[in-house]
């Protein structure tokens, strides 16, 4: 049994038999973990209203097998208010975490970045694009995606802000005269290195890069959150 309270968030939940739920959590010390919430669907269950996305939780669970049982869950703070585009962006973040994180592997630093990300989505929705790109770069780092944005992979020389570079997966950036989906301006790469997405062109380039970089982790299956976003807010999708 986990004796100490563990901080965590609901990433996703699904029905299990008649009265229970299987809940995917992102926890500070144990990373992503799936727990059985017995009786959580019952009307009088104290878990029914608590197990919601974007609610900071304190958790306890028990069990020795692969599927452990949630024994207690209490809100540590109020649910972060997500609306419209911010809500679907938050669901997107939750979905990619479910898809890419190893089960029961600690990502302590990433947990803090996740907390910062959803807080900013809730409180600063006008900065949504910057918030998402910043989190995606932190996620890639947590996954061990080691790309040097400041050095040319072919020469070992510093990236030139005025030149263009072709991205080669698992190798890095090479000076190139080509202009295609895998080509990036040096000034944008240097901004990536600093985590500076204040420039509009850099922000768009960052979105392009993270989609390329996350593709091997996410696989070919479409993101359900993006499909939902397309169906409900198609006119806003291009800016997210």
Curated annotation (Swiss-Prot):
Protein name: DNA repair protein RecO
Name of one Pfam family that matches: RecO_C
Alphabetized UniProt keyword annotations: DNA damage, DNA recombination, DNA repair
Family: Belongs to the RecO family.
CC annotations in GO: bacterial nucleoid
SUPFAM superfamilies membership: ArfGap/RecO-like zinc finger, Nucleic acid-binding proteins
Protein's job: Involved in DNA repair and RecF pathway recombination.
Record keyword DNA repair present: yes
Lineage: Bacteria, Pseudomonadati, Pseudomonadota, Gammaproteobacteria, Pasteurellales
GO biological process terms, semicolon-separated: DNA recombination; double-strand break repair
